[in-house]
Swiss-Prot record:
The chain crosses the membrane at residues 13-33, 50-70, 97-117, 126-146, 153-173, 210-230. The complex is composed of 2 ATP-binding proteins (YydI), two transmembrane proteins (YydJ). It is a multi-pass membrane protein. Induction: Transcriptionally repressed by rok, this was not found to be the case in another study. Disruption phenotype: Up-regulates expression of the LiaRS two-component regulatory system; this effect is more pronounced on modified competence medium than on rich or sporulation medium. It comes from the Bacteria. GO terms for cellular component: plasma membrane. This is Probable peptide export permease protein YydJ. The gene is yydJ. Keywords: Cell membrane, Membrane, Transmembrane, Transmembrane helix. It comes from Bacillus subtilis (strain 168). It is found in: Cell membrane.
Amino acid sequence: MKLEFKKSISNKVIIILGAMFVFLFLLGYFLLVGIDKVSNVTPEMFFFSSYTVATQFGLMLFSFVIAFFINREYSNKNILFYKLIGENIYTFFYKKIAVLFLECFAFITLGLLIISLMYHDFSHFALLLFLFSAVILQYILIIGTISVLCPNILISIGVSIVYWMTSVILVAISNKTFGFIAPFEAGNTMYPRIERVLQSDNMTLGSNDVLFIILYLVSIIIINAIVLRFSKTRWIKMGL
């Protein structure tokens, strides 16, 4: 983990992530002021608008930095080095994922904390921290899995965008049939429920929605583990 943190700092990954989250929250605010012409932005509006940016544009925003953090090891031919220090495809991948998520979690917490302090409103802080973290974690896992399979960053980004567009189209066709593919998508049933919760005095989502999100993330992790299991040889070949 220490090695990956050092690489994140030396490769400016942590700086890029910080800039992305600043942009995400600022875009959430300016969409309300500039597009919706809202004169009095409430904390609920600000948070939900920022959440919308994260769910609708997050994959495009974060695909580069996530793919870069993994694919750079292929382009620099570093996989043999990882093998020599006792790493395998699982430790290689999950350490990188852990570092990316911890850094994102820190920026999410900081962003929500600053906004909550500005409005003196922490009523939905825990819920928002859970939702933003879940949304970003899915991006890290999905883009990370794609990046492990792809030989360079451009292909990883391209495949990730195709995946995102396909999931949006499928949910638009039928959120009952394909809703599990992209639970945070605006066309899905959970999206309006989250908006209602943020506009009310309820502090959290219903237990069914929370369980659904957890099962979704666990499913991605299981699929990822299966993909890694059958990619051991490919991982070594692409990094030599």
